[in-house]
């Protein structure tokens, strides 16, 4: 394959069945990587696997430590070079209306999920010629937003974990980075638009425009733009880039 810097590398993408995760999977495959998709939704995983052809797929809830351990136990026969932590969920509510269940879900999936997968993957990544961990955080991991305190707390945690792991593994071939998108044109953002429209009694077009106005470019970020940033950090040539939280937000966060 021409221009395939990830030829022979194997990459795990969590939440790889749709949205940013699927865009990342496509991009890594185009660069030559062999894919393993993890996700909770078997139907989405199946559709992604059929589209991508050669990809493996494992049903896995990243928020469940046992589930993650079982999934990664299937990967020990061959080297692993890349882990992309993309699986995530978002719920919105004022803090006083945030239930314990919502708080726990936000931390369990968005933060503990990254911890579980990184812990399981690191022995394999260290043993490979090069290793990459890239976590899809959010601009909510860099600044605060109203009505998503639990989500912000989790994503700030992802950025902190990224920086700590980058230092912990600085003397190995493993780099650890985060990509922090603004609002991305994905099914999850469409759910956010619907919730915003309901909460503000606006139609969906007006609600979408509210999100677009947060971006100085006055648009939603494309999933492929996030995927390109992730893919760049996964390259063997990106060895000197570690501990970074890179905003992909049209200038919303600088």
Labelled PLM ranges:
Residues 17-18:
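Conserved glycine-rich cofactor-binding loop
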Residues 138:
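Residue(s) in the substrate-gating loop at a strand-loop-helix junction
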Residues 170, 175, 241-243:
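Short, small/polar-rich loop/turn modules that mediate ligand/substrate recognition or access, typified
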Residues 123, 167-168, 239:
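Alpha-helical segment proximal to the catalytic Tyr-Lys
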Residues 94-95, 102-107, 211:
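Substrate-binding pocket helix/loop in short-chain dehydrogenase/reductase
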Residues 115, 217-248, 253:
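C-terminal substrate-recognition "lid" of short-chain dehydrogenase/reductases
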Residues 118, 154, 162:
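Active-site helix of classical SDR
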């Amino acid at each position: 394959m021409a221009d395939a810097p990830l030829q022979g590398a194997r990459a795990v993408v969590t939440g790889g069945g749709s949205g940013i995760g699927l865009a990342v999977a496509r991009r890594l495959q185009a660069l030559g990587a062999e894919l393993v998709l993890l996700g909770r939704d078997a139907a989405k995983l199946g559709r992604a696997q059929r589209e991508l052809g050669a990809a493996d797929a494992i049903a896995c809830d990243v928020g469940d430590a046992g589930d993650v351990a079982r999934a990664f136990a299937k990967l020990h026969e061959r080297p692993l070079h890349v882990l992309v932590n993309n699986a995530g969920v978002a719920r919105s509510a004022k803090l006083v209306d945030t239930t314990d269940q919502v708080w726990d879900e936000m931390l369990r999936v968005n933060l503990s999920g990254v911890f579980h997968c990184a812990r399981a993957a690191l022995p394999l990544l260290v043993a490979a010629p090069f290793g990459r961990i890239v976590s899809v955080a959010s601009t909510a991991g860099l600044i605060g937003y109203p009505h998503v305190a639990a989500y912000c707390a989790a994503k700030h945690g992802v950025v902190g974990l990224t920086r700590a792991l980058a230092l912990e593994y600085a003397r190995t071939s493993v780099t650890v980075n985060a990509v922090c998108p603004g609002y991305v044109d994905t099914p999850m953002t469409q759910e956010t638009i619907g919730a915003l429209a309901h909460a503000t009694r606006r139609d969906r077009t007006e609600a979408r425009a509210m999100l677009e106005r947060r971006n100085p470019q006055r648009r939603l970020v494309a999933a492929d733009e996030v995927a390109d940033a992730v893919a760049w950090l996964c390259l063997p040539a990106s060895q000197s880039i570690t501990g970074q939280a890179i905003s992909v937000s049209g200038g919303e966060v600088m």
